[in-house]
């Protein structure tokens, strides 16, 4: 016995996890796996798991509409209940992508609306959607559609909305924020109020749609479950009856104070008792008291479209200690941010948008600098999201954010060019410290000024951004060498946007080849050639390259070393696609592919 050598342990496939777990159990387990990355990993275990993932997947997000074929999606996930689809590059939001660029919803709706019999929710973002597309969707899915989100879309009219309102009686969410909609009358809202009794969320914020306050009141009477309304401009004094009726309302944005300074006109405005998310338009100093009675209850406050001064911001925010989300313009100033740091200890999201470019106003009100950001970092240590336009910034402020804001998953900073001199450039050490310490970061954007980040700083971003999946960089680096050093470290980066950088087409191509997880890159403003031939160095299977040439005027301008100057017109879009080259490129976009 003592001299016997035990047999080596062998894995018996008959006893493997895959074989003894029945399909029913795997269906249940898969039903609780929601993270798409976990889903993808599970589907690769074996064919059986792949099949069960296909049958149990409830939601899919297609991050770029040209990355997949609608027919393949239908075959792969026949029981989808929810689909999100993104179209044009983010630059479309800033006027850098023309309307006729593409991203048409028609192929997706025509292919999927009828066959996906379980589809209850559709979210389209930055896409061209026509009345005919919406009509096709309503014909196929109107009887069971619960959620329709058209986010920053173009191409449709209120005729289509009227059809949705009349036919989709199970609709719980209708989202139209920042859509360009042809207004053919407000009947759509009346139809919605008459035909729907289950609506929870209605959003037509930042559109130019005109509606009748009486229809909003009727909607509130018939939809007792209405929790969120974000609307276009409408005088707040005309919404008094609506607010009295909408007792369940928790989230309101829009309306307007059309007669700023009229002390008595808005005295009777009383918000519903459960309201805790608020954004008001054109509010001035005299209208602030309308918020004070329930300011302690506010969890979200949006002051981006108000006429408030820095002092007004200080006064309001001091009364809102329970804020989780704050959205303002940079008129809040460093003083306002100091109040935020002292008061809003629970704050999770802070957005500081660009304000008025009038230098006189900025001198009077201040603007945001390293002082304000440092105060927020020290005082609001639960922050998960910061997006800020700043007039000045230092390495020390970025280090403070890295030291105190350990929960950050999304950080975006834009350094404005209105100041002649910035205190502390380059920002290499500050960026390095922020990335090293904020290990939960998944999204990172840094738009600076020339000289804002050296090649060393760019390499730090690559070295310490191992978990970041999306990145936007502008005016960073000094040479092609810096870009290559950056790319070597970006092992998990999936989406990259570059603007106003000094890189050549060859360097861009070599950088792409260094990033193994990259699925999408968009570049605007670089040292472009007239043909884009060096971009073919990044060519590989399933990789589409689309090139917008530089303007002829800029192409004739060369740097001292004979290289093309940075051209703001030239663009590159490259992405993985299982659908092949797209067939709807406009004439001014040139698809590049090896001969």
From Swiss-Prot:
Induction: By the leaffolder Cnaphalocrocis medinalis infestation and methyl jasmonate (MeJA) treatment. It comes from the Eukaryota. SUPFAM superfamilies: F-box domain, RNI-like. Signal peptide: none annotated. Jasmonate binds at residues 90, 351, 389, 412, 499. Residues 20-62 form the F-box domain. Keywords: Jasmonic acid signaling pathway, Plant defense, Stress response, Ubl conjugation pathway. Expressed in roots, shoots, leaf sheaths and leaf blades. Coiled coil: none annotated. InterPro entries: COI1_F-box, F-box-like_dom_sf, Leu-rich_rpt, Leu-rich_rpt_Cys-con_subtyp, LRR_dom_sf, Transp_inhibit. SMART domains: LRR_CC. One of its GO terms (biological process) is regulation of jasmonic acid mediated signaling pathway. One of its GO terms (cellular component) is SCF ubiquitin ligase complex. The keyword Calcium does not apply. Pfam families: F-box_5 (PF18511), LRR_6 (PF13516), Transp_inhibit (PF18791). PANTHER family: F-BOX/TPR REPEAT PROTEIN POF3 (PTHR16134), S-PHASE KINASE-ASSOCIATED PROTEIN 2, ISOFORM A (PTHR16134:SF148). Interacts with TIFY6A/JAZ3, TIFY6B/JAZ4 and TIFY11D/JAZ12 in a coronatine-dependent manner. Interacts with TIFY9/JAZ5, TIFY10A/JAZ6, TIFY10B/JAZ7 and TIFY11C/JAZ11 in a coronatine-dependent manner. Interacts with TIFY11A/JAZ9 in a coronatine-dependent manner. Involved in jasmonate (JA) signaling. Required for jasmonate signaling in plant defense responses. Can complement Arabidopsis coi1-1 mutant and restore jasmonate signaling. Required for JA-regulated defense responses to infestation by the leaffolder Cnaphalocrocis medinalis. May act on an initial response of jasmonate-regulated gene expression toward drought tolerance as part of a BHLH148-TIFY11D/JAZ12-COI1A complex. Component of SCF(COI1) E3 ubiquitin ligase complexes, which may mediate the ubiquitination and subsequent proteasomal degradation of target proteins, including TIFY/JAZ family. Plants silencing COI1A and COI1B show increased plant height and seed length, are hypersensitive to gibberellin, and display reduced sensitivity to inhibition of seedling growth by jasmonate. Plants silencing COI1A show early and reduced tillering with few grain filling, and display increased sensitivity to the chewing insect Cnaphalocrocis medinalis. This is Coronatine-insensitive protein homolog 1a.
